[in-house]
Amino acid sequence: MAPSGPGGVRRRCRRVLYWIPVVFISLLLGWSYYAYAIQLCIVSMENIGEQVVCLMAYHLLFAMFVWSYWKTIFTLPMNPSKEFHLSYAEKELLEREPRGEAHQEVLRRAAKDLPIYTRTMSGAIRYCDRCRLIKPDRCHHCSVCDKCILKMDHHCPWVNNCVGFSNYKFFLLFLAYSLLYCLFIAATDLQYFIRFWTNGLPDTQAKFHIMFLFFAAAMFSVSLSSLFGYHCWLVSKNKSTLEAFRNPVFRHGTDKNGFSLGFSKNMRQVFGDEKKYWLLPIFSSQGDGCSFPTCLVNQDPEQPSTPAGLNSTAKNPENHQFPAKPLRESQSHLLTDSQTWTENSSNSGRCKAGMSNPALTMENET
């Protein structure tokens, strides 16, 4: 086998280094289990009832923490479906034509039947030069993964993965259960921390573990509470981290609340319709990740929606099994709770995204 070049060696080294934060969290979690379950509950606690209650509650939180963390790490980010990729002939035309009207016409023809409503800051179709595809709404190119990610929120080094449509719910639950895990440890460890601090308990091997465990749990509780609170706010507004920093641009212009459907509908966009799955790291988000219902406050173009009959979710996001195309819907200027989304055969058909498109240019977003 031919030796790999310097570029291949660097890529492999980077891939190894990217796992360091995950290994750190895993080692810290393993030590916290030993410190709490063994040194605190079994060695230091004298009351049997207290031991049983603390161990049962701790193992429940520990299991949910590990489950959600695992799902966040190993759920593959979803990429745009084939319909957003340019055909071989279209790619050849783009390579032959200069960056002029002929070049733009190729993109115009490719995008006219796609359910896309967001644009670049200049009003052009969002196109990725590296992936050679037209970006779906809320899709962005990750420079670390070097691919376009559906509804990308951010690339998280602590999970060594892109957080997007396929695993955003898992990421939220990971934050929630890790926060509860740290708060529970800090609360139940506090009295023993004070007793060791005031020399109320003899110096033993457990002293270091119990005291350091409290400091670590309290420190992580503070940082996790702010991060979890921020993402709860994002969910309530139906925004991603990228959209919070840069408002999405639609055909009519910038609209910071363009995807907000109201608190209840925003929650269901992420957690799904069946509340029994909300607290479990099981995929239940609405939609297919390629098109999203919008609430346009400045203009009233036709928008894709998810009617009741098509409200099925992609049960296996890793396999890219998307539900049927959403029907089009003419929405009012403000989407209210009194609106009902019903399937109407007279309204069905493809949304013609290219009817009022401005001149198209290329976008290279990393």
Swiss-Prot record:
Predominant location category: other
UniProtKB keywords: Acyltransferase, Cell membrane, Endoplasmic reticulum, Endosome, Golgi apparatus, Lipoprotein, Membrane, Palmitate, Synapse, Transferase, Transmembrane, Transmembrane helix
Active site as annotated: C156
Keyword Acyltransferase found: yes
Residues spanned by motif NPxY-like endocytic signal: 357-360
Keyword match Zinc: no
Protein name according to UniProt: Palmitoyltransferase ZDHHC2
Native organism: Rattus norvegicus (Rat)
